[in-house]
Amino acid sequence: MKVLKFLFIAVIIVGLSGSLTWASPIANARAEADAEAAAEAVAKAVAEAVLPALPLLAGLMSLPFLQHKLTNG
């Protein structure tokens, strides 16, 4: 019974602390814009990294098709 009471209190505390964090006046008002900018930067970096390897990746992805054609005619 003590464990259930402890878990109940812990869930309430975690829930309240989460809601207080979102309602805090020091919360970042531009959080969505910042997250979008960060995601765009990551997408651009990944695209720049993958672009030189794209022909190699395309060749490797066609290997199962070629093997099937060679073995099954």
UniProtKB/Swiss-Prot annotation:
Functional description taken from the UniProt entry: Vertebrate selective toxin that causes pain by targeting tetrodotoxin (TTX)-sensitive sodium channels in peripheral sensory neurons. Converts the normally rapidly activating and inactivating sodium channel current into one that does not inactivate. Is active on both Nav1.6/SCN8A and Nav1.7/SCN9A, with a much potent activity on Nav1.6/SCN8A (EC(50)=196 nM on human channels) than on Nav1.7/SCN9A (EC(50)=1.9 uM on human and EC(50)=1.2 uM on mouse channels).
Highest taxon above the source species: Eukaryota
UniProt tissue specificity: Expressed by the venom gland.
Molecular function per GO: sodium channel regulator activity; toxin activity
Name recorded for this polypeptide: U3-myrmicitoxin-Tb1a
Subcellular location: Secreted
Asparagine amide modified-residue sites: 72
Key word Signal present: yes
Organism, scientific name: Tetramorium bicarinatum (Tramp ant)
GO CC field: extracellular region
UniProt keywords, alphabetically: Amidation, Ion channel impairing toxin, Neurotoxin, Secreted, Signal, Toxin, Voltage-gated sodium channel impairing toxin
Signal sequence extent: 1-23
Propeptide: 24-49
